[in-house]
């Protein structure tokens, strides 16, 4: 067993022991209808940012604060930077906003009242992506509780507008470049191959926008004379 593996064993045990507490924290976050696509839910998005910040602090992250740029919904930033200047810094990303529930009559239960069925937790945001926030923070807590320190410097960035395409992300990254500077980014917002089989995703397509201009004829023509034979 390598030294790194041996050091991680008690952390994994702590994660297992704290699983129920992490699930309860996730349920509390899921109960907040932080739908970034709905302007009428702006208060809920703010409430979600408040709850996310409180949870990060409770897990031992420091200098936790909310941040906005160019009128964006609130994001949450936190950090733990005591591993030393010659140790890599890892940026952990998640988002606290969610998609609308869609046709609520098709839900078996209230989308914003999490329930456990057959060993699985159901509710809007249980996977995408409030689980990512909890996974990151619970991992930090497990390391601090067992080892007293993290093996690397850690920053956490929990976005508030991912589900609408992150329209202010460029401005946000420019304004908070120093706060988010890191050697590697870990994103807790991808898929697994199957239940119990994790996947390691190393690239995502992202989004690209643009304008398309079409030019047609100056005037109408007879389709039988100008059209081609098909």
Language model segments and positions:
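Acidic-enriched catalytic cores of C-N bond-cleaving enzymes acting on peptides and small amides
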Residues: 193, 202, 223-230
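Fold-independent oxyanion-binding glycine-rich loops
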Residues: 94-96, 118, 160-161, 188-191, ...
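Acidic/His- and Gly-rich active-site-bordering loop/insert found
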Residues: 2-126, 145-150
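Short small-residue beta-strand/loop micro-motif enriched in glycine and branched aliphatics
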Residues: 121-123, 218-224
């Amino acid at each position: 067993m390598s030294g790194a593996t041996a050091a991680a064993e008690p952390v994994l045990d702590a994660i297992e022991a704290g699983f129920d507490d992490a699930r309860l924290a996730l349920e509390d976050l899921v109960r907040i209808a932080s739908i970034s696509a709905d302007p009428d839910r702006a208060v809920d998005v703010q409430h979600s940012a408040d709850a996310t910040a409180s949870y990060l602090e409770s897990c031992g992250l420091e200098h936790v604060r909310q941040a906005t740029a160019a009128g964006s919904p609130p994001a949450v930033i936190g950090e733990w930077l005591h591993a030393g200047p010659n140790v890599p810094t890892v940026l952990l990303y998640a988002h606290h906003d969610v998609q609308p529930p869609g046709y609520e009559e098709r839900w078996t239960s209230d989308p914003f009242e999490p329930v456990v069925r057959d060993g699985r937790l159901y509710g809007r945001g249980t996977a995408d992506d409030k689980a990512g926030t909890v996974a990151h923070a619970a991992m930090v807590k497990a390391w601090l509780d067992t080892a007293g320190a993290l093996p690397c410097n850690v920053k956490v960035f929990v976005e508030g507008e991912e589900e609408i395409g992150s329209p202010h992300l460029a401005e946000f990254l420019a304004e908070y470049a120093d706060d988010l500077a890191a050697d590697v980014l870990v994103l807790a917002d991808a898929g697994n191959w199957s239940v119990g089989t994790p996947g390691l995703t190393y690239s995502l397509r992202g989004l690209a926008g643009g304008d398309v201009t079409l030019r047609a004829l100056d005037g109408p023509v007879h389709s039988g004379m100008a059209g081609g034979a098909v």
